[in-house]
């Protein structure tokens, strides 16, 4: 049976101590034979609303901490890059390079990521027609010498895409579940359940969010039939230094993931 992809971890590396505490609580997912698990955290949040917002420890220290998670817990790592020159050093640690939603059309960034040995996760921009993500996927595939298109070509060559909501007026996002079906024509699809409930800039210099909708939307995405899920999670989201309002508390993640596995099994049995 095909494994469900699960990407989870704190939004940003706040400290090595916090990262290890979260990784300790996520290790059961890494050991689950039905899950392909990736630990996620960012070394630099370069697109924060305010210049005064916490960004993370930076490239050098951040990669050391992510490598220590890999060494201690045997987890694969996903982290995002914002500049082309970050691709090579980050790929020495990360198994997946993530392209931020705001940068999903940036050719140089996509090409730099695709030139590495890492997989590439392209987050669909909040502004983007879901069918247009195919052009970003093609940039990555053609960089890897692949002229074929479609789901199978992307899957075989380590390229997948993520839905994280679409702009719905000012300071709000909405999830169009049709996007999951459309994007899956071009690549494996991950549903970013936590950023999809974000309210950009709604907290006055930072983003707000409605975390009570994370689990219902994740269940809906599972019922559509996709490849995996992305959750930013924290021991205490209220104290998180980034994206706390839309994070899922670690205490809720286990039951949520178990439910998603059950839904996916039902979908597979009825196809």
UniProtKB/Swiss-Prot annotation:
Its main location: cytoplasm. InterPro entries: Aldolase_TIM (IPR013785), DAHP1/KDSA (IPR006218), KDO8P_synthase (IPR006269). This is 2-dehydro-3-deoxyphosphooctonate aldolase. Pathway: Carbohydrate biosynthesis; 3-deoxy-D-manno-octulosonate biosynthesis; 3-deoxy-D-manno-octulosonate from D-ribulose 5-phosphate: step 2/3; Bacterial outer membrane biogenesis; lipopolysaccharide biosynthesis. It is found in: Cytoplasm. GO terms for molecular function: 3-deoxy-8-phosphooctulonate synthase activity. Belongs to the KdsA family. Keywords: Cytoplasm, Lipopolysaccharide biosynthesis, Transferase. It comes from Campylobacter jejuni subsp. jejuni serotype O:23/36 (strain 81-176). Disulfide bonds: none annotated. NCBIfam families: KDO8P_synth, PRK05198.1. It catalyses: D-arabinose 5-phosphate + phosphoenolpyruvate + H2O = 3-deoxy-alpha-D-manno-2-octulosonate-8-phosphate + phosphate.
């Amino acid at each position: 049976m095909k494994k469900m992809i699960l990407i989870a971890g704190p939004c940003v590396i706040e400290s090595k101590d916090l990262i290890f505490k979260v990784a300790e609580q996520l290790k059961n997912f890494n050991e689950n034979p039905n899950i392909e698990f990736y630990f996620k955290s960012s070394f630099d949040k370069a697109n924060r609303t305010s210049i005064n917002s916490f960004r993370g420890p930076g490239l050098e220290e951040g990669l050391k901490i992510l490598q220590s998670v890999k060494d201690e817990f045997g987890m694969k790592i996903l982290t995002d890059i914002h500049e082309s020159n970050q691709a090579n050093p980050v790929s020495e640690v990360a198994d997946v390079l993530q392209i931020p939603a705001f940068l999903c059309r940036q050719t140089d960034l996509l090409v730099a990521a695709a030139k590495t040995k890492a997989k590439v996760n392209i987050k669909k921009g909040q502004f983007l027609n879901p069918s247009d993500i195919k052009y970003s996927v093609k940039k990555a595939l053609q960089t890897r010498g692949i002229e074929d298109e479609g789901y199978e070509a992307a899957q075989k060559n380590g390229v997948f895409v993520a839905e994280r909501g679409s702009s719905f007026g000012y300071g709000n996002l909405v999830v169009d579940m049709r996007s999951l079906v459309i994007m899956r024509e071009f690549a494996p699809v991950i549903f970013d359940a936590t950023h999809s409930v974000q309210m950009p800039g709604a907290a006055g210099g930072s983003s707000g969010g409605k975390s009570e909708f994370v689990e219902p939307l994740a269940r809906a995405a599972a019922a559509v039939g996709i490849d995996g899920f992305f959750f930013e999670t924290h021991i205490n989201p209220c104290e998180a230094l980034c994206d706390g309002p839309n994070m899922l508390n670690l205490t809720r993640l286990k039951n949520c993931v178990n439910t998603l596995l059950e839904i996916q099994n039902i979908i597979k049995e009825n196809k």
